[in-house]
Amino acid sequence: EALQVLRDELPNVDVVISSNYSPRLADALTKGKVDAAFLRREESAPELAYELLVKEPLVVVLPSDHRLATLESIRVQDIIGETFLSVSDTAPALRAVIDNYLKRSGINITPDHEADHLAMGMSLIASTRGVGLLPAYAQNFLPSSVTSRPLKGETPTIDLVLGYKKSNESLILKLLLSRLDELVARVSKKPR
């Protein structure tokens, strides 16, 4: 969607797409290697500015044939005693949201496994028959052996933001920021 917004205004703009962990994206923004990035808010980078795109709810991710998959929604207490997978420190913002949610819920779970990225998480869930908490966008990438269910009750969220260096004077960045409301509206209308 962001590319379409830019192409509408600047059909000859050259955009490079890459995928990386939020801390690395924040570092690239800080060093001026990229003008903008979609990432999780990194508190350790005060020279960056963030524009909120969406608050993503966390969902329970589990094997499709898991006993909890028969439920429409899952109480966080239902995961006690299950093999629990969390994210590693490659995603510190997400890890903090998960850990704080469990703590607020009065649940003390030590992860049995930690995943560095989404594909690893899906593989671990399928192979260990464990459960995990991930942002709702992960539902777009689930293999048939893995499903998701919403959390019952208070649902934690994690911000997806557009990050950029405050001192960046790029005209393309300014254009993207000027069309941010349109971008958010387009993304909000898309079904998950």
Q: What residue spans do the PLM features occupy?
A:
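Residues at or immediately flanking beta-strands
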Residues: N12-V16, N108-D112, D159-V161
